[in-house]
Amino acid sequence: MEPIPAPAIDLISLAPVLVLSVFGMMVLVTDLFIGKDKSILVFISLTGLLMAAISSFAKYNLPVFSFNGAYVVDHLSVFFTFIFCISSALAILVSVDFNKREGIKVGEYYSLILFCTVGMVLLASSTDMIMIFLGIEVVSISLYILAGIQRKNTKSNEAALKYFLLGAFATGFLLYGMTLIYGSTGSTKLTIIAKVISENKILSEPLMLMGVVLLIIGFGFKVAAVPFHMWAPDVYQGAPTPVTAFMAVGPKAASL
């Protein structure tokens, strides 16, 4: 039995993801050992975002392929990584006074924003449905918790529950659609799927068509696109104001 070759992994191309993950965990650990003054957590979070933005420019010979082509760093993904880091940094800065006033536990708050940024970076560089699904779920789970981070606020709890239930509903559609597309094309890579569709004209086949429809429905719910946006007003109203601003910008751009 021949051994399965390991996919090529370029750690430099993964630098923004690794940096954000490390700093997200660093924020959580630091929060356990400091007193009431949590200002150092803001500094750590912003430093992590700055280093991630800088590290996204570490590769000059673009595009760079990793994980057997499932993760691609090109000029577009570098641009969006920079945009995501800026939007996350702004979300942290506008949250400082709000968190103090509302008594929010900032360790979890800042780390979740960093982990959400990890998911957005994955989405911007993904060329495989499995990687896309992974990025979407990292973003979604982070936002579920951020929406309900005001645990004593009933509106925040309601927003988090609605967001979680509808998000799980959308995930089911998304995953089922990806499964049908994989069954029709035999691949999860977007480039191969596009090639199979163009060469074999299978877009009109029932299995493929149903997969595309379910995929559109799942993405529509995730990005609050019409007519799948009915959950957005209630969730945006109940979530903390800085979280609402963050949800309306970065994750939407990443999904699109």
Task: Describe these PLM feature segments.
Residues 1-256:
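Alpha-helical transmembrane segments of multi-pass membrane proteins predominantly involved
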